[in-house]
Structure formats: structure tokens, C-alpha cells
């Protein structure tokens, strides 16, 4: 089980709802992933009108928990306003907080992110902040009241996997009581397994599944990889070595020498 604020979930995979080839494939992919939390963008999905009604109907049919996000917001005021609208629409205090600094890299504006988190937490929100892998930023978010932190592995949609393993490991080591979710930049199931082997509590995926040749099959692949990575972490991974170490010990006399 993984805990997000005061709620527990069985799946360690959070999944996005954008970019799929069709609404039906989106539904099937989410089901196959086993995800219980689905992120939705207030700015990029139409909440009203015929298309919006169809989209929300499909999400409701899945019986999942909706995590609204502030994707596309470029400043503190924009992010805070969007979060408040999301709370009214979805009747939830949860918000995946994104404050973007640059359109080319979609890198988080970490200064604005911390400020927006402080404002929203004081207003009763439970914030899921999308941030870089910088420890000082993560600690400021925790000090602001965030009990979940979501560092990127690489820029959104890049599919590069974990580019700064040491920094992500440091976050896990220094924030043992915080729910940590790798968010953005994963492109293959092996990337998700690596994140879980580092001890991360969950991963959030969208593009890697939605843009696969077979999104439904890829959703299952990520589900299995996350389970495998978490199992490996809990089992206790052996440490890496600089030199070889024999797997079969040499003890006593070879058995063929012992035969008279």
C-alpha cells in the first residue's frame, strides 16, 4: 500500500489522461495499468460542453480518484486560481501543482512553486508539487507542508529516464517519511523499475503510455515493472561492486578427487 496524505492505495502507478489516440484507448489503458489515481488538466481538458461531458463520463466510469493539475500555468497567481477552480469542479482538496518556468524544457519554476504551495496549503489544499530533483527545493516544499513531493526524472515527455540517479537517491535518503513520486521523463518500463528500486513510493506516467504503439500493452508493461522494482527494493538489493566476486565458493577438495 502507498499513502497519499491520509488515503491509502494499492497501486503505485499514477496515470495521466491526455494524448491517447482515442477515448476508448485511454479507458482501456488506465484499466490495464491498475492505476487508482488519474491526473486531469483543467486547462487542457474541456470541463464543459459535449466533448467535456464525454471525457468526464469516461473518467467516472473508471471509478478512479481524480487528481487535478495546474499544467500550463506560468505563474503563482495562475496556478493558485486554477487550483481553486479545480477544487470547485471536482470537490477535492488534492492538487498536482505545476508552475512552469520555460516552455521549451517545461522546467518547474521552483521559486514560484514553493510560493504557490504555501498559499494553497494555507487555504486547505493537499499539494502534490511537481519539482526538479534539487534537495533544497524539496526540503522547502516539505517545510511548507507538502507530504508528497514529485521530482522529475527528466523533462516532461522526453522519455530519457532517470538522468540524475544520485540526486534522486539523495532525496529518498534525506526524506524518508515523505511520499516521493517520480514524475516526468520516464519512457520505458525499465525506467519505472529503476525508480522503484531506489525506494520511491510511486511513479506518474502519461506520455510513455499514451504515445506507445500499443498503449494498452504498454500500460501493463509499466504495471509489471513497477511491481518488480518495488519487490526488488523490499527484498533488499545487493550493492554494486567494482570487482568480480565468485558466486560459487571454493571449499575443500574437488568431489572428483575425493572418489577412491
UniProtKB/Swiss-Prot annotation:
CDD domains: ThiG. One of its GO terms (biological process) is thiamine diphosphate biosynthetic process. GO terms for molecular function: thiazole synthase activity. Its EC number is 2.8.1.10. The active site is at residue 96. Gene3D superfamilies: Aldolase class I. It comes from the Bacteria. Its main location: cytoplasm. It catalyses: [ThiS sulfur-carrier protein]-C-terminal-Gly-aminoethanethioate + 2-iminoacetate + 1-deoxy-D-xylulose 5-phosphate = [ThiS sulfur-carrier protein]-C-terminal Gly-Gly + 2-[(2R,5Z)-2-carboxy-4-methylthiazol-5(2H)-ylidene]ethyl phosphate + 2 H2O + H(+). 1-deoxy-D-xylulose 5-phosphate binds at residues 157, 184-185, 206-207. Pathway: Cofactor biosynthesis; thiamine diphosphate biosynthesis. Coiled coil: none annotated. One of its GO terms (cellular component) is cytoplasm. It holds the Pfam family ThiG. The keyword Transport does not apply. SUPFAM superfamilies: ThiG-like. The keyword Ion transport does not apply. InterPro entries: Aldolase_TIM, Thiazole_synthase_ThiG, ThiG. It is found in: Cytoplasm. Keywords: Cytoplasm, Schiff base, Thiamine biosynthesis, Transferase. Catalyzes the rearrangement of 1-deoxy-D-xylulose 5-phosphate (DXP) to produce the thiazole phosphate moiety of thiamine. Sulfur is provided by the thiocarboxylate moiety of the carrier protein ThiS. In vitro, sulfur can be provided by H(2)S. Belongs to the ThiG family. Homotetramer. Forms heterodimers with either ThiH or ThiS. This is Thiazole synthase. It comes from Rhodopseudomonas palustris (strain ATCC BAA-98 / CGA009).
Amino acid at each position: 500500500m502507498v499513502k497519499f496524505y491520509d488515503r491509502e492505495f494499492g497501486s503505485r502507478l499514477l496515470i495521466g489522461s491526455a494524448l491517447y489516440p482515442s477515448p476508448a484507448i485511454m479507458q482501456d489503458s488506465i484499466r490495464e495499468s491498475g492505476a487508482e489515481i488519474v491526473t486531469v488538466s483543467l486547462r487542457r481538458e474541456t470541463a464543459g460542453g459535449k466533448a467535456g461531458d464525454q471525457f468526464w463520463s469516461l473518467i467516472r466510469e473508471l471509478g478512479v480518484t481524480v487528481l487535478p493539475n495546474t499544467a500550463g500555468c506560468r505563474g503563482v497567481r495562475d496556478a493558485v486560481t486554477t487550483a481553486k477552480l479545480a477544487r470547485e469542479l471536482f470537490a477535492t482538496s488534492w492538487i498536482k501543482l505545476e508552475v512552469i518556468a520555460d516552455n521549451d524544457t517545461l522546467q518547474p519554476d521552483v521559486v514560484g512553486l514553493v510560493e504557490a504551495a504555501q498559499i494553497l496549503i494555507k487555504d486547505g489544499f493537499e499539494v502534490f508539487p511537481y519539482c526538479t530533483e534539487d534537495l533544497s527545493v524539496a526540503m522547502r516544499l516539505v517545510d511548507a507542508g507538502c507530504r508528497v513531493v514529485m521530482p522529475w526524472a527528466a523533462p516532461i515527455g522526453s522519455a530519457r529516464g532517470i538522468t540524475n540517479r544520485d540526486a534522486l537517491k539523495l532525496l529518498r535518503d534525506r526524506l524518508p517519511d515523505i511520499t516521493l513520486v517520480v514524475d516526468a521523463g520516464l519512457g520505458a518500463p525499465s525506467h519505472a523499475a529503476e525508480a522503484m528500486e531506489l525506494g520511491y513510493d510511486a511513479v506518474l506516467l502519461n506520455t510513455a503510455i499514451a504515445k506507445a504503439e500499443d498503449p494498452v500493452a504498454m500500460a501493463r508493461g509499466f504495471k509489471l515493472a513497477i511491481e518488480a522494482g518495488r519487490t526488488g527494493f523490499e527484498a533488499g538489493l545487493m550493492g554494486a561492486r567494482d570487482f568480480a566476486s565468485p558466486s560459487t565458493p571454493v571449499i575443500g577438495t574437488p568431489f572428483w578427487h575425493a572418489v577412491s
